[in-house]
């Protein structure tokens, strides 16, 4: 079945109430951007939203490999997963506004891959080699945390291929034009054919900007 979610900036005092409203409207997910100079902290607001809801998925929309260490992200996600009763999702991209507003560049594809692999291993309770230091979430019992789905937001072909390799979910960020969606789907399908991964094991979606107005031109 298709799912529909809303991307909403985390806003202290409002996120939990609005999360309850969109759940009552029938939406399936709430995603809060992790962009520290433009909005509040997403994880605190998502945990408050978890307490105010019962069904919807809760996710960053998106986080990035630049502004938080992978262990910090994993710890925040594990906490949200426990607080929400298993409704957390790990949605990540290369980093745009979050990096630009502190004078840093987006993560390269290889950096994104390493970061996602580290977060995945932390969440599974495994040790992660951090430049010779054996690191893990010592407060988390290995295997005790329900799986947190990995969702990679993709714009270019390299990131789409990476997402097909690593993620549970792929979210295209290529606009709403049908020809752009068809192109992105083509790249994903080619990678699935190359690796032999079962298409049924991967959920595919898209970020779409939606503006309601009586005038199409405006």
PLM feature segments, named:
Residues 70-81, 212-217:
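Catalytic cores of alpha/beta
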Residues 2-13, 63-70, 144-155, 210-213:
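Active-site mouth loops of central-metabolism enzymes
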Residues 5-9, 33, 59-61, 91-93, ...:
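A cross-family glycoside hydrolase active-site/sugar-binding cleft signature
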Residues 96, 176, 207-214:
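Glycine-rich beta-alpha junction loops
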Residues 34-37, 63-64, 175-179:
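Short, acidic/turn-prone active-site loops that include or flank metal/cofactor-
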Residues 2, 74-169, 174-202:
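Internal, glycine-rich beta/alpha segment that forms the wall or movable "lid"
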Residues 1-61, 148:
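N-terminal beta1-alpha1-beta2 module of alpha/beta enzyme domains
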């Amino acid at each position: 079945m298709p799912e529909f979610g809303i991307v909403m900036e985390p806003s202290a005092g409002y996120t939990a109430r609005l999360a309850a409203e969109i759940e009552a409207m029938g939406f399936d997910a709430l995603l809060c951007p992790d962009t520290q100079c433009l909005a509040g902290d997403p994880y605190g607001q998502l945990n408050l939203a978890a307490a105010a809801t019962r069904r919807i998925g809760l996710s960053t929309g998106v986080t990035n490999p630049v502004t938080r260490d992978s262990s910090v992200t994993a710890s925040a996600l594990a906490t949200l997963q426990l607080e929400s009763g298993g409704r957390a999702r790990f949605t990540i991209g290369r980093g745009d506004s979050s990096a630009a507003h502190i004078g840093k560049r987006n993560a390269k594809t290889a950096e994104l891959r390493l970061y996602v692999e580290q977060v995945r291993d932390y969440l599974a309770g495994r040790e992660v080699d951090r430049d010779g230091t054996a690191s893990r979430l010592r407060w988390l019992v290995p295997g005790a945390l329900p799986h947190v789905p990995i969702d990679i937001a993709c714009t270019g072909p390299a990131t789409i291929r990476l997402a097909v390799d690593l993620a549970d979910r792929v979210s295209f960020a290529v606009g709403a034009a049908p020809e752009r969606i068809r192109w992105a789907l083509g790249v994903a399908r080619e990678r699935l054919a190359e690796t032999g991964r079962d298409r049924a094991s991967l959920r595919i979606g898209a970020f779409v900007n939606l503006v309601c107005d009586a005038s199409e031109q405006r």
